[in-house]
Each structure stands twice: as structure tokens, then as C-alpha cells.
Amino acid sequence: MIKDERWEGVYSFEDSPYLMETLTNLRNVSTENISFRKGLVRLGRYMGYELTKTMEFEEMHVQTPLEKTKGIFPKDRSNVVIITILRAAFPLMEGLIKNFESAKVGIVSASRGHAPDFKIEMNYIKVPQVTPEDTVIVSDPMIATGSTLIHVLKEFKDSKPKRMMIVGVLAAPEGINAVKAEFPDVEIFVTKIDDKLNNDGYIVPGLGDAGDRAFGEPFKVSMLPQMHNLE
């Protein structure tokens, strides 16, 4: 894990050949949906493991079949809330939660409009109560403009959680700057920080639309009435 000196509390995993190999497969335009999903799960599991190293542990004593010995207890891991942004973040969350099995999970449905305003619409939010003892982890594969994440983080600002983290696959510097301007204390963990955003708000070189690549392209809304009329 590498601390990026351009910002406080921003880390990447560019020093991990294993994750860089996984990312290479995700970038490949020929990678199929199932392989893409598995790659996101893999990244989530690895990054979740690394996150546990940043949490507090308490010393404890445990009785083995032979004698007592010292061990550790994860103090923070029992107070984790994972927030998943539909739909691309589901596989990433699946990997994360393997390291935080007692975590509470919240779901947010948010969509970003087109350039130039990139308007954010939050259509659905169902999250557990957050307390000052909790660590909130927001999983979103792509930190592009940062607008969606800012909207989500605002939902928890008044709860004053102990820590707020973002876990993603790729980030653009523009997105990190936007998030940090609103939430300077949020911690950001991504596999890699890419070069920039293009005019359409996509990360470059990026990996395309993570949701479509993980689950397939969705039906157009105009097709839904036709589906309802099918007998």
C-alpha cells in the first residue's frame, strides 16, 4: 500500500503485482462479465484485508488445549458499516465483507447525468443507523467526478462516524480533489490513480462503465412498457 503524497489520507496498491495483474484483466476490453465480476470481488477482498491493518486491536488472553496465551481482538471490526452504491459496487462489496463479516450494510442507488453538469440523482437509500463508534466504508469502483460520493458522504456527516473511508478500483485526480475539498478527513483507498477525466466524465485510461462490464448493458427505459405488455 502506497501513500500518495499529493493528498492526505489517499492510498493506492500500485506496489502489488497481484492487484496490478487483476486490474490489467479488468481494463481489457475483451474481458467477459463473469471474469470482470470475479476480478472486482478479488480486489475488494484484498483491499479489505489491507484495511484491517489500519484498525485498532486489543490484546486478550485465550485458553488453548495446552495453556493460556496472548492473542488479539479486532476492536474496530465489530463497528463497520459498508455502503454499496448500485450496481457496480456489489462485487467489490462482496469481497470487502469477507474481511468484515459482522458489518452492517447499506444500499444507495445513485446515477450521474451527462456532461457538462453531471447532475446526481439519488433514487433509493436504505442504510443502517451510523454512530460515532462506527467506521463507514463506501464502496464504489470508480472515483471519477466524485459527485456521487460527495452526495453519499453527506448522508452520514451529521452522525460523526469515527472514520469514513472510500474503497474503489480507479480514481481520477479530479475526483479525489472534489471529495477532499468537501471531506478533508475521508480516507481513500484505490487500486490505482489514473491520469485524468475525459470530457464525458470517464476515467482515462480507465476500464469503461464498471456496471455495464460487470452485469451487462441494461435495457433502455423506452423498452419497459413493451415488456409490461407481453403476454
UniProtKB/Swiss-Prot annotation:
Provide the cofactor list for this protein.
Mg(2+)
Q: Where does GTP bind?
A: K38, G39, L40, V41, R42
Q: How is its activity regulated?
A: Allosterically activated by GTP.
Q: How is the cofactor bound?
A: Binds 1 Mg(2+) ion per subunit. The magnesium is bound as Mg-PRPP.
**What GO molecular function terms would the record report?**
GTP binding; magnesium ion binding; uracil phosphoribosyltransferase activity
| E.C. code | 2.4.2.9
Domain of life the protein comes from: Archaea
Q: Which residues bind 5-phospho-alpha-D-ribose 1-diphosphate?
A: R87, R112, D140, P141, M142, I143, A144, T145, G146, S147, T148, D209
Q: What happens when the gene is disrupted?
A: Loss of sensitivity to 6-azauracil.
Q: Which pathway is it part of? A: Pyrimidine metabolism; UMP biosynthesis via salvage pathway; UMP from uracil: step 1/1
Please name the InterPro entries in this protein's record: PRibTrfase_dom, PRTase-like, Upp_A, Ura_phspho_trans
> Has the keyword Transcription been applied to this entry?
no
Q: Which reaction does it catalyse?
A: UMP + diphosphate = 5-phospho-alpha-D-ribose 1-diphosphate + uracil
Q: Which GO terms describe its biological process?
A: UMP salvage; uracil salvage
Task: Give a single Pfam family match.
Answer: UPRTase
- Assigned keywords, A-Z: Allosteric enzyme, Glycosyltransferase, GTP-binding, Magnesium, Nucleotide-binding, Transferase
Q: What does this protein do?
A: Catalyzes the conversion of uracil and 5-phospho-alpha-D-ribose 1-diphosphate (PRPP) to UMP and diphosphate.
* Identification of the protein by name: Uracil phosphoribosyltransferase
Gene name, Swiss-Prot/TrEMBL: upp
